[in-house]
């Protein structure tokens, strides 16, 4: 119907334009009045037939559909423009409309960022959990150490009170007199607890210098009051006993020691340990008790003011003696005050790989302790690589006496000193090595030996003698071991 109306309107307008319009009024058959308005077609001489009218109507319908499609397209574009205008007015940066590919890329980037954030979150949570566990372990260790400290404080206070009591005057005598007791009943009266006071026994402690107990024999070995030296030639070395294993690669080589002349606050059980793999070795781990040493709980960590070199360090009379890195200087470090007390350059001594033991490791200068005192084992150009042995003053590090042996230093794996006699070990890696040479400083002579020595872990980098325990201490391929020994009587 709209199409027909448009067609009639067009005809009407055309008729008006041509000024040929006619207006008629007449009654129809039923008597009703009808008005008729006629306009001549400007382009058609006669009216079209019914089929032609339908074609015109269909064309108008197609035009209407096309106009609707155009209108929908226009609406869509208008919506896009409105969206863009909204973005511009809301402060977002202007630019071309995002394509589907752009949105996909942005979505992928957001997904990657989310995955990275999730990974970082998991790592942080894991690190936090580890820190919480470490904190709990440290707090538990702190509580344990505090409890031990309190126990030690109580024991120290008790000991102080006991010493003070012992230092007071003579104990009071019994008030009852033996004269009041008949002679025939004196033996019985001694056990009459109802009428007799008790007496306290007084105990006095007297410090005696070691020089009064140990006197040197003509050979230079220490002698006790009965005349025996307590020394002899090494005749047997027992099987190694493993006390501890290092946890990290820095513990492949190392040195561990106890003080045979310990002074307060240290005891014969206080143990020190140094891992010697690295270029800047300064940490010295201290353990109050053997149990803490075997369990791996240091009570203190010293940081040396100068780095040390290799495995030749020893502890003696409360001080750590060691070779300074890349030098022929020997240092004395006071463990109580944590300060350097003395240093001395060993004249002509090879260092940093000039005259090491056969296993290497910059073992040019090796310190040792025995019943007589502090020693240093080394070699020089003048000695042509043979072992040189010097007795050191433990306070000043001055050389007191020097011996040159006929044992080539690089031909042996390690050396130690017992009662003034130098002993060497044939191999650092063979399971069935031997103690193969002995040099007696008392007589200035050497001889070959064949005392079996076991390298259980096949890489012994340190062997030292502890005169207090009469044992050998060794570091064998991450493992800290000890050996029982036997000496023949002189």
Swiss-Prot record:
PROSITE patterns in UniProt: OLF
One Gene Ontology cellular component: extracellular space
Extent of the signal sequence: 1-18
Keyword Metal-binding in annotation: yes
Region of interest (Disordered), ranges: 152-186
Gene Ontology molecular function: any one: metal ion binding
Annotated Polar residues bias: 173-182
Cysteine disulfide links: 231-419
Span of the annotated motif Microbody targeting signal: 488-490
Binding site for Ca(2+): 366, 414-415, 463-464
Residue intervals of the Olfactomedin-like domain: 230-489
SMART domains, A to Z: OLF (SM00284)
Protein localization: Secreted; Golgi apparatus; Cytoplasmic vesicle; Secreted, Extracellular space
The protein's name in its UniProt record: Myocilin
Organism per entry: Bos taurus (Bovine)
Highest classification ranks of the organism: Eukaryota, Metazoa, Chordata, Craniata, Vertebrata
Gene designation per UniProt: MYOC
